[in-house]
Amino acid sequence: MTNIRKTHPLMKIVNNSFIDLPTPSNISSWWNFGSLLGICLILQILTGLFLAMHYTSDTMTAFSSVTHICRDVNYGWLIRYLHANGASMFFICLFLHVGRGLYYGSYMFMETWNIGVILLFAVMATAFMGYVLPWGQMSFWGATVITNLLSAIPYIGTDLVEWIWGGFSVDKATLTRFFAFHFILPFIIAALAGVHLLFLHETGSNNPSGLSSDTDKIPFHPYYTIKDILGALILILALSSLVLFSPDLLGDPDNYIPANPLNTPPHIKPEWYFLFAYAILRSIPNKLGGVLALVFSILILALMPFLHTSKQRSMMFRPISQCLFWLLVADLFTLTWIGGQPVEHPFIIIGQLASILYFSLILIMMPLASLVENKLLKW
């Protein structure tokens, strides 16, 4: 008799995705982040669901309802901090996952990569709207500043901003719709992640060498299930440590002050995972130029397959490209640091140089380095 997992319509999908899936035998721990992102998403949906049971999306009561969750709800503080810091872990895994894709040339799977870029935008939008919900000072002013960027769009900008606000400023209507969008988007993300996996399983996984692994495949279970469980335990350990020992480490103290439209905080800045993009935005003196640079700083990922000039897929055997890749990583750390600093000398010029370097590395230096490496192959 054939095993039920190979015949049952639903079990068959699970079997072909997580059990009998032929997987390259040499994929490293850098391939763990897909499953970790799945765990993060499930955690965020569950904690978010329980938070939504006690949260009220009204300007008068939003801040108080979050305080009520932390003080009066059983383990409410734990759920709230798991959700807030879970977002940070989500982005750490996302950045490492994207970095892995860039290093090993996984972007050559075009459909998988493009859905990944859409997923990145969706997660960033979700995180931004979630940050507005506690209705603290940084929530309110962050929402005001970021939504206001759309006013830079010629002709329709101002109308567009007022349409998103649902009025002439960030107010009750804005908070209510942000809560609605923040609730629905994770389910859209889950669906997109399913499509992401669907396209990945059409081609099979890439591997560190960038060479075809068709001749050497092993079943996903038990080899990679046990490996993913180890990754999950490390993720849970890191998240638990953050939540239980320093839950406010990555947050902004200003968000413990209720939103006040009459008092602007001295330094408006987003959560740490947006700082690199925020630094690029601020480094351009022109409003529309800054917005375009901000969008393009993420959208540039979609161009990666077209900027690939090397004869090899992976960077494993390309030392010049490796150096430039790690320079790009260092540059992103620099941009993240600058994004959290006030707009004054010398931070302005450092931010501008780091922004120029970011685009130069991706658009000019890395494709040229690949061409040089192609020549070295012949030499």
UniProtKB/Swiss-Prot annotation:
It is a multi-pass membrane protein. GO terms for molecular function: metal ion binding; ubiquinol-cytochrome-c reductase activity. SUPFAM superfamilies: a domain/subunit of cytochrome bc1 complex (Ubiquinol-cytochrome c reductase) (SSF81648), Transmembrane di-heme cytochromes (SSF81342). It comes from the Eukaryota. CDD domains: cytochrome_b_C, Cytochrome_b_N. A ubiquinone binds at H201. GO terms for biological process: mitochondrial electron transport, ubiquinol to cytochrome c. Its cofactor is heme b. Component of the ubiquinol-cytochrome c reductase complex (complex III or cytochrome b-c1 complex) that is part of the mitochondrial respiratory chain. The b-c1 complex mediates electron transfer from ubiquinol to cytochrome c. Contributes to the generation of a proton gradient across the mitochondrial membrane that is then used for ATP synthesis. This is Cytochrome b. It comes from Mogera wogura. The gene is MT-CYB.
